[in-house]
């Protein structure tokens, strides 16, 4: 049996045992922090920076890569963390399909949902190079990759590495 330890999230005392990172502790406590790149079954990557939290005495940390420690005092939605997340979203949208905010998926897209939640109505940093779309890569029988919609979270690369679908046959 693993000993229970305690930390504090927004002033609430939260017990944890063997969770690998702060994000898992936060989720098990029934709280939410946005994230794009985190997948519980893959190695933590910390690429998207949406899961930032403020840790007293340590500043801003990505909750998916920081291990929990007894006594930590964590703040989820401070003005600073919300501002950082909004900037991350604005930068992701700058390199994203220009029709994202009016996309047909309307509501079924995490990027669109977070843009709405953080009050992003227009693309603040338009990328002039994205006037022409990159071709869709449908060469794989398993994955169709549209680079115009990719947010560089790394989840597909890590999933393929773990599942060994990145290995090639003798003919390729």
Annotate each language-model stretch with its function.
Residues 1-135:
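Signature of N-terminal electron-transfer/Fe-S-associated modules in redox systems
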Residues 25, 91, 156-159, 163:
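Generic, well-ordered alpha-helical scaffold segments in large soluble proteins
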Residues 165-172:
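Conserved small/polar residues in nucleotide/adenosyl-binding loops
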Residues 143, 147-159:
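Internal active-site segments that recognize and position negatively charged phosphoryl groups
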């Amino acid at each position: 049996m693993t000993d229970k330890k305690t930390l504090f999230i927004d002033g609430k005392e939260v017990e944890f045992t063997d969770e690998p990172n702060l994000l898992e502790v936060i989720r098990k406590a029934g709280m939410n922090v946005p994230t794009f790149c985190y997948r519980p079954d893959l190695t933590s990557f910390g690429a998207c920076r949406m899961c930032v939290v403020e840790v007293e005495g340590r500043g801003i940390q990505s909750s998916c890569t920081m291990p929990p420690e007894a006594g930590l005092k964590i703040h989820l939605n401070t003005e600073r963390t919300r501002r950082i997340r909004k900037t991350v979203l604005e930068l992701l949208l700058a390199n994203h399909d220009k029709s994202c905010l009016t996309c047909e998926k309307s509501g079924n897209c995490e990027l669109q949902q977070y843009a709405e939640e953080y009050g992003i109505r227009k693309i603040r940093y338009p990328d002039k190079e994205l006037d022409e779309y990159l071709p869709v890569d449908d060469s794989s029988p398993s994955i169709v990759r549209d680079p115009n919609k990719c947010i560089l979270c790394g989840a597909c690369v890590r999933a393929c590495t773990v599942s060994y679908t990145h290995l090639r046959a003798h003919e390729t």
